[in-house]
């Protein structure tokens, strides 16, 4: 099928290119995560932790306050392990400079009761350790609102997903009487997380310290996975696609290049070389994964809305490679769902070409057994038997 050719006019050769993007930052260092002002994070006694949980629960389910929102972060820092001893999982002190840190007690207004009677009633049958462990678990679950809408959290609470996860994870009964979702309180918490630097700075201390957590299962389940790679679907889609089709990093980057996305692929290459390829450890906290929470200009070219075609190609590869489920289909990414039908068809065909190259062509170069273009056996009528009947010879095309 012939296509018309574009004739470029010299009159437009000196025009300044418009990309729709502002100049963004191409890197992020771990120290930036702990450089922001924060509320003071400290080890709480059991008695103080119980009070902090009650303040947090009052703010989430009864009446919101800046003090209660800060309590969510304080209790996340005081999360407990699932074993009977219930020891703290975060270090005693965060790594940030504490000269400008704010004491949460400064948020308390004299004469205001920060603990509601309903909260006292709902937790009264639980032991102190149960209150602390369950309260911190719920508090940590709200941190996803730093990157995602509060409606996702309220729906999870209404369907008892969070309560069930606590029971399953801790192998014990959920200890509180039922709290009814308060959408207004959840929305206020979401807006505070999204818009106020002190809360974000406190989150930064928590995320930096994830590398010090011996058993990260709770943190990964409750907020790590939800906050990582904010708005950058290209990163998990790329790594999943590489795993799915067995491509080299250079091979997949090359296959994805169509010229206009070269800058995106070069930024991805830079991120792979400087951060993604390095194992986490004391000298690599991998906080780049959360950078866009604190500075939206970081890795801007990797934001999905600026590289939708590339993400769509990768998502289609993963869909073909079955690295998706009914509930986590990569093609359900909002930006991809909004693409025009023609664009969806085009990117899917490109994905098929890439998938075919690495799954058939590249393998066939090393072993004829994988050359399914050249050698094909006739399938049985029910299409469940992919082996030729005895005595048959392969059909060459």
Curated annotation (Swiss-Prot):
The keyword RNA-binding applies. It is found in: Virion; Host cytoplasm. Keywords: Capsid protein, Helical capsid protein, Host cytoplasm, Ribonucleoprotein, RNA-binding, Viral nucleoprotein, Virion. It comes from the Viruses. Pfam families: Rhabdo_ncap_2. GO terms for cellular component: helical viral capsid; host cell cytoplasm; ribonucleoprotein complex; viral nucleocapsid. GO terms for molecular function: RNA binding. Encapsidates the genome, protecting it from nucleases. The encapsidated genomic RNA is termed the nucleocapsid (NC) and serves as template for viral transcription and replication. Homomultimerizes to form the nucleocapsid. Binds to viral genomic RNA. This is Nucleoprotein. It comes from Lettuce big-vein associated virus (isolate Japan/Kagawa) (LBVaV).
């Amino acid at each position: 099928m012939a296509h018309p050719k574009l004739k470029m006019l010299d009159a437009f050769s000196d025009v300044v290119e418009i990309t729709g993007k502002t100049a963004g930052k191409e890197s992020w260092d771990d120290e930036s995560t702990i450089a922001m002002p924060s509320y003071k994070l400290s080890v709480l006694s059991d008695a103080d932790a119980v009070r902090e949980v009650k303040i947090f629960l009052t703010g989430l389910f009864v009446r919101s306050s800046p003090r209660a929102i800060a309590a969510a972060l304080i209790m996340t820092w005081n999360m407990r392990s699932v074993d009977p001893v219930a020891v703290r999982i975060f270090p005693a002190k965060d790594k940030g400079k504490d000269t400008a840190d704010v004491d949460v007690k400064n948020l308390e207004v004299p004469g205001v009761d920060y603990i509601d009677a309903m909260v006292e009633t709902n937790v009264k049958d639980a032991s102190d350790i149960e209150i602390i462990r369950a309260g911190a678990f719920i508090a940590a679950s709200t941190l996803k609102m730093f990157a995602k809408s509060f409606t996702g959290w309220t729906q999870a609470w209404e369907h008892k997903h969070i309560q069930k996860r606590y029971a399953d994870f801790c192998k014990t009964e959920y200890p509180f009487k039922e709290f009814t979702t308060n959408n207004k309180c959840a929305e206020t918490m979401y807006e505070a997380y999204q818009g106020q630097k002190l809360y974000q700075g406190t989150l930064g201390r928590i995320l930096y310290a994830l590398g010090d957590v011996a058993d990260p299962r709770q943190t990964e389940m409750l907020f790590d996975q939800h906050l990582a790679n904010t708005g950058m679907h290209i990163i998990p889609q790329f790594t999943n696609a590489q795993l799915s089709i067995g491509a080299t990093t250079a091979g997949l980057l090359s296959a994805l290049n169509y010229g206009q996305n070269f800058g995106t692929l070069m930024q991805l290459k830079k991120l792979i070389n400087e951060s993604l390829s390095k194992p986490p450890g004391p000298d690599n906290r991998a906080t780049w994964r959360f950078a866009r929470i604190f500075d939206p200009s970081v890795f801007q070219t990797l934001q999905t809305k600026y590289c939708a075609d590339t993400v769509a190609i990768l998502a289609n590869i993963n869909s073909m490679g079955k690295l998706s489920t009914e509930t986590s289909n990569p093609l359900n990414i909002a930006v991809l769902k909004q693409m025009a039908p023609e664009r969806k068809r085009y990117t899917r065909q490109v994905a098929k070409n890439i998938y075919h190259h690495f799954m058939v062509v590249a393998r066939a170069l090393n072993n004829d057994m994988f050359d399914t273009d050249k050698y094909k056996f006739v399938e049985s009528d029910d299409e469940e038997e992919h082996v030729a009947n005895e005595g048959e010879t392969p059909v060459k095309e």
